[in-house]
Curated annotation (Swiss-Prot):
Higher taxonomy: Bacteria, Pseudomonadati, Pseudomonadota, Gammaproteobacteria, Enterobacterales
Protein name per its UniProtKB record: Multidrug resistance protein MdtK
Pfam families for the chain: MatE
Keywords tagged on the record: Antiport, Cell inner membrane, Cell membrane, Ion transport, Membrane, Sodium, Sodium transport, Transmembrane, Transmembrane helix, Transport
Membrane topology according to the record: Multi-pass membrane protein
One MF term in the entry's GO annotations: antiporter activity
Localization per Swiss-Prot or TrEMBL: Cell inner membrane
Keyword set includes Membrane: yes
Functional note: Multidrug efflux pump that functions probably as a Na(+)/drug antiporter.
TM stretches of this protein: 11-31, 53-73, 93-113, 127-147, 160-180, 189-209, 243-263, 276-296, 314-334, 350-370, 387-407, 418-438
GO cellular component, as recorded: plasma membrane
């Protein structure tokens, strides 16, 4: 029992800074929305539309680079720290190549925006302008993620938290300058949010690099002088590990976007209630997601040390802590669902629907926690392909079709509206949790030699 308590302390010490970093990132988006809304409703809508396109694109790159964390954790655990710098250099090359592709997609996103039904031309122009300003931040964001993954792979999660809050503090005044045109800068409205956010990502990257160069704990990990050439073998391995994670993230984000589109014809009350419940459950999701990042680090580190039993302990502890957290958040959600809904809106119909949907959200808290921590465990074992297959099957083959049938058809029951989609979420997330656990058990029952061989690839 003592080993589980010790492991839980280590996991929480790693996870809490990740939680705070995620809060800072979420707050940046909130600040952009509020400050753009203070300028005009059109600018706020433009930022919202632009963000809905930016997020799937940048999260694809983010997911691709998540492969670095278990690789570095495993090298650190095995005492092969001299190889870490080379992995990081190749991570920067990969981030550079991916950012070019993302920038090309975002530059041409105007075709998607202008094809939206009945969109106001002025709104479309502002959304395109916002994206074309923001896209210059894509390299900065991805380079920052490489540096952050280096730190997190070495079990240093506090730097990412600190840089997140530095970014938030810089974002507010820079937003003000470019939205309203102060200190000789042009008045750009919502487009100014894109300029500010792009600048902030570069500031965060440069601040993180400055920290890494000065950190005593990383003195033995230094990039060699001059520009290192791309190493096709290392980059291929990073892509093999990272692409399934990237695709899983992409399909997860697009799933919620598709559901939002399917709910939109149902009316203002249904859309508002759905959005409130989804926004709140997304905030609660930060807890297990951050714990999953910590579990990846611990499992990778233990496998690097050559201890499959300690890796199992880290995995089991992560799941136990995650279930405890999810139970508390579910109780919190059920107890205060109406008060929470009132923070967003005071329309009685909207509050009633949102509170009802939050009950369904509370039902899947534990499943959601298990599936996301299970994903973190599999990343630690470098078993990333199964993450994609499980996620795609659970969300797109089981969750979305069942949600659609319940919400919009009378094949099973009378059309349930948004609640049908939320039952679909429960089906999808529970299926994902079961499949993640089955895959984890399969891996852990393999001979230790095979587990360590797979982890050292």
């Amino acid at each position: 029992m003592q080993k589980y308590i010790s492991e839980a302390r280590l996991l929480l010490a790693l996870a809490i800074p990740v939680i705070l970093a995620q809060i800072a990132q979420t707050a940046m988006g909130f600040v952009d929305t509020v400050m753009a809304g203070g300028y005009s409703a059109t600018d706020m809508a433009a930022v919202a539309i632009g963000t809905s396109i930016w997020l799937p694109a940048i999260l694809f790159g983010h997911g691709l680079l998540l492969a670095l964390t278990p690789v570095i954790a495993q090298l650190n655990g095995s005492g092969r720290r001299e190889r870490i710098a080379h992995q990081v250099r190749q991570g920067f090359w990969l981030a550079g190549f991916v950012s070019v592709l993302i920038m090309l997609v975002l530059w041409n996103a105007g075709y998607i925006i202008r094809s939206m039904e009945n969109i106001d031309p002025a709104l479309a122009d502002k959304a395109v302008g916002y994206l074309r300003a923001l896209l210059w931040g894509a390299p900065g964001y991805l380079f920052f993620q490489v540096a952050r993954n280096q730190c997190e792979g070495l079990a240093k999660t506090k730097p990412g938290m600190v840089m997140g809050f530095i970014g938030l503090l810089v974002n507010i005044p820079v937003n003000y300058i470019f939205i309203y045109g102060h200190f000789g800068m042009p008045e750009l409205g919502g487009v100014g949010c894109g300029v500010a956010t792009a600048a902030v990502y570069w500031v965060m990257f440069l601040a993180m690099v400055s920290y890494i160069k000065r950190a005593r704990s990383m003195r033995d990990i230094r990039n060699e002088k001059g520009t290192a050439k791309p190493d096709p073998a290392v980059m291929k391995r990073l892509i093999q590990l990272g692409l399934p994670i990237a695709l899983a993230l992409f399909f997860e984000v697009t799933l919620f976007a598709v559901v939002a589109l399917l709910v939109s014809p149902l009316g203002i009350v249904d859309v508002a209630g759905h959005q409130i419940a989804l926004n709140f459950s997304s905030l609660m999701f930060v807890l297990p997601m951050s714990l999953a990042a910590a579990v990846t680090i611990r499992v990778g580190y233990r496998l690097g040390q050559g201890s499959t039993l300690d890796a199992q302990t880290a995995a089991r502890t992560g799941l136990m802590v995650g279930v405890c957290m999810a139970t508390l958040t579910a109780i919190f959600t059920v107890s205060l669902r109406e008060q929470i809904a009132l923070l967003y809106n005071d329309n009685p119909e909207v509050v009633t629907l949102a509170a009802h949907l939050m009950l369904l959200a509370a039902v899947y808290q534990i499943s959601d926690s298990i599936q996301v921590i299970g994903s973190g465990i599999l990343r630690g074992y470098k078993d990333t392909r199964s993450i994609f297959y499980i996620t795609f099957t659970a969300y797109w083959v089981l969750g979305l079709p069942s949600g659609y049938i319940l919400a919009l058809t009378d094949l099973v029951v009378k059309p349930m509206g948004p609640a049908g989609f939320w039952i679909g979420f429960i089906i999808g997330l529970t299926s994902a949790a079961i499949m993640m656990m089955l895959r984890m058990r399969f891996l852990q029952r393999l001979p230790s030699v095979i587990i360590l061989q797979r982890a050292s690839r």
